[in-house]
Amino acid sequence: MVRFEFTDSADKHGIPHPDAEHAVMHHVEYEILQPRRTGEQSFMFVGLPHPQALRYLEVGVAVDGRGRRIIFHAMEVTDLYRH
């Protein structure tokens, strides 16, 4: 099972953690971002928060050098990631 950690900024828009995790695990699209810190890889995933959802989420995830997956951003998808 993949485990995620959440930063305070991930909670800014009130997206429940299980919804953000589901969107990442069942994403329909992703983009590689500039790393937030040295030694990290950062991604923005777009996916549904649950199978019956009509609106997509964008979820930012950083993977650090130890393999920890850290969700730092979660909100309804914006035009920047809507394709």
Protein language model regions, located:
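Ribonuclease/tRNase effector modules and their secretory precursors
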Residues: M1-H83
